[in-house]
Amino acid sequence: QGHAFWGPAVFCLAAAAAVFCMVRDDPHALGLEPFGKEAQESAQTRALHALHPTRLRWAMVQLAVLLVSGIGATGFTHLMTLYMAEGMDAMRAAAAFSLCGLALMAGKFACGALCDRLGSYRSNYLLFGCFILGYVLCTLAPLRSAALMLASAVFLGFGSSLNTVGISIWAADLSTQERYESVLRQFQAAYGLGGLVMSFLPGAIADLTGSYAPAYALFAALLAFSLFTLQSTYRLARK
């Protein structure tokens, strides 16, 4: 089984070397021109960039980022534990975990494309819907249904793209070009803190209730709160 880790390790080393050689802060550093051309901002985008939320509203937005990132990381890593604790076969649970990873990869590709095509506001509903549905399906783990397990893995993985790609998109939407780096740093700090704060919850709740499923129910509710917070902030720009 140890040999299974060699492939990902070699791939990560090769990818890191490629990124180090090719990625620069400025395309001109490699004698290149930026791909494409600057798009015209819509009235909605200009209104978002001009938005100046109150301190309370901004604190709620950062809390939403913290929750999304912490729940995304914690729910993903505990998925296999959830189903094995409910008596699912280890190999089936491992297959579901792998499927979740593939769905996450697909979600990262789709997230940006959806935001470009539909806009961030509508894309948030779609991606959060998948995310929340995945966690709701996880609460049904005690039923020991292989079909529900695989479905939960797909929806949870696809929606988990929000806690990586989504954060940079929200930072771009809710800032100006001058403030983008500052806002992104704040969101990244919330991202890191979320992983620390939320990581202990599944185990603690399982100790109290005898199951990991209630933790996923709590996570679904917190994601719904995060969706409400972000979308209500976006709607401020529509007034």
Which residues are covered by each model-predicted region?
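Helix-loop-helix hairpin linking two adjacent transmembrane segments in secondary transporters
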Residues: 1-28
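Cytoplasmic membrane-interface "Motif A"-like loop-to-helix N-cap segments
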Residues: 117-128
